[in-house]
Regions:
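Short, conserved phosphate/pyrophosphate- and ester-handling motifs at nucleotide-, phospho-/glycolipid
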Residues: 194
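Conserved beta-strand segments of alpha/beta enzyme cores
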Residues: 44, 68, 173-175
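Conserved acidic residues
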Residues: 3, 43, 91, 121-123
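Conserved core of the sugar-phosphate nucleotidyltransferase
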Residues: 56, 60, 103-188, 203, ...
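Residues that recognize and position ribonucleotide moieties
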Residues: 14, 101, 138, 191, ...
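Short active-site loop/helix that positions an aromatic residue
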Residues: 199-206
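N-terminal glycine-rich phosphate-binding loop and ensuing alpha1 helix
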Residues: 3-49
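Short phosphate-binding loop-to-helix
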Residues: 51-116
Length: 243
C-alpha cells in the first residue's frame, strides 16, 4: 500500500508573503521542514505547489535540492492533492502544511500505523487532540478526495479540503489521533502565520542548532516548558485558537 507525505506550500500569503522561503539560520523554512521529515521517517515526500508564476521560486528551490515537486491549481487544493497523489501512485496522503516547520515526524508515522490497523478515509491529529498547533498532520485517502471533488464545487471546500470531512462526517470513515501525553501542549502555537510566529520559530532553532540540527517534539516541548516567556512572542495573536 502506497503512502506519501504531501507538503502543501505556496508563496502567496496575505499575512506573511513568501514565508516558505524565509530563512532560518541561512536555510529556507520549507527546506528545514522537509529535511526534518527526511531525517526521522522513511516515507516519500512531495512538495505540492501551484502553477502560478508566484510559486516559481518554490519550484526552483525544490529543483536545486532535488526535492520532488508537483504543481497544480492555485486555489483548488483538492484537485492538486488528487493529481499529485496519482502522479506518485499514493493511495494514502499524509498532508502537511507548509506553514509548519516543526511538524512532528512521529505524528506522520503514527498516522500511517493507525491506518494500517484499519483503513480510514480520514485520520486527523490536531490541537483539539492535544497536539501543539503546527506540529500535527492528517491522513487522507485518495478515494475520499475523489469523492469530494465529485460531490461539491464549493470553492471553500475545494481550497481548504479538511472542513468538508467534518461537515459531512457521516459520509466517511474518520478517526482521531490523540497526542502522546509527554507532548500534550495544545496551547503551544508553532505554525507560521505572522512575523511574530516566525520569530518564535527562530528562537527555538537558535537554541538547538549550535549543537543539534534535528530535534524531536519532546525536546521542543521541554525547551518551551522551561522558557515559557517565549510564548509571549506570539500569544496575543492566537488567543482561543482552534483547529
Amino acid at each position: 500500500m502506497s503512502y506519501g507525505i504531501i507538503i502543501q506550500s505556496r508563496f502567496s500569503s496575505s499575512r506573511l508573503p513568501g514565508k516558505a522561503l524565509l530563512k532560518i539560520k541561512n536555510k529556507e523554512m520549507v527546506l528545514r521542514q522537509i529535511q526534518r521529515l527526511q531525517h526521522f521517517i522513511d516515507i516519500p515526500i512531495v512538495l505540492a505547489t501551484s502553477t502560478d508564476v508566484t510559486d516559481d521560486p518554490i519550484a526552483d528551490l525544490c529543483k536545486k535540492h532535488k526535492i520532488k515537486c508537483y504543481r497544480g491549481p492555485l486555489n483548488n487544493l483538492v484537485q492538486r492533492l488528487i493529481d499529485c497523489a496519482k502522479s506518485h501512485k499514493f493511495k494514502y496522503i499524509i498532508r502537511v502544511g507548509g506553514d509548519d516547520p516543526l511538524i512532528d515526524p512521529e505524528c506522520c508515522a503514527k498516522l500511517k500505523i493507525e491506518n494500517e490497523k484499519e483503513k480510514q478515509d480520514f485520520i486527523y491529529a490536531s490541537c483539539r487532540e492535544g497536539w501543539p498547533y503546527g506540529c500535527a498532520a492528517e491522513l487522507i485517502s485518495l478515494n475520499s478526495l475523489t469523492r469530494i471533488l465529485s460531490n461539491t464545487n464549493d470553492s471553500f471546500y475545494l481550497e481548504h479540503t479538511i472542513p468538508y470531512y467534518f461537515d459531512n462526517y457521516k459520509d466517511f470513515k474518520i478517526k482521531k489521533l490523540p497526542s502522546p501525553k509527554n507532548i500534550n501542549r495544545p496551547n503551544y502555537y508553532f505554525s507560521v502565520d505572522y512575523e511574530e510566529d516566525f520569530k518564535l520559530i527562530n528562537k527555538i532553532f537558535e537554541h538547538f542548532l549550535p549543537h543539534k540540527e534535528f530535534f524531536d517534539m519532546k525536546e521542543i516541548v521541554n525547551f518551551i516548558d522551561n522558557n515559557k516567556e517565549l510564548l509571549h512572542i506570539n500569544s496575543n495573536l492566537h488567543n482561543g485558537f482552534t483547529r
